[in-house]
Amino acid sequence: MRKLKIGVVGLGSIAQKAYLPILTKEDNWELIGAFSPNQSKARLVCDRYRIELFSRLDSLAQQCDAVFVHSATASHYEVIKRLLDLNVHVYVDKPLTEQIEQSEQLIELADLRQKGLMVGFNRRFSPFYMALKYDL
């Protein structure tokens, strides 16, 4: 069975703390590389995790089945729209977008392209949230 090819967009603290340590060690998929507009900072992160740095979003997307988006919320709409236009499945950290209309457009586009569009809350199972849920 062919391994799922994934990429990462945005290499800030969330990507570095919560995602890259797992994505770079798992054998069930192939981490193709990453893209970030801040290429100098991205180079340091990619070197640390031994992954390829792409200079263009399109170049990364064309080699991936799915992309994790960890960029600034203000960029989510444009980044996700472009990825869906390139027929790539998308996982994005919450929130999907800053405006409900943009979120609705992306959901419609994902449906049209028959691509997965998932919004994650990476602390859902943290001890604090689990305790709070239990107390409620």
How should each PLM-predicted stretch be described?
Residues 1-49:
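N-terminal Rossmann-like dinucleotide-binding module
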Residues 12-14, 72-75, 123-125:
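Short beta->alpha connector loops
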Residues 15, 55, 92, 117-119:
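Hydrophobic residues in well-ordered beta-strands that form the structural core
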Residues 29, 65, 88, 115-116:
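Short, well-ordered coil/turn segments that N-cap beta-strands
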Residues 49-91, 95-107:
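Beta-loop-alpha module in the N-terminal Rossmann-like domain of NAD(P)-dependent dehydrogenases
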Residues 98-136:
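A contiguous active-site-proximal alpha/beta segment in oxidoreductase catalytic domains
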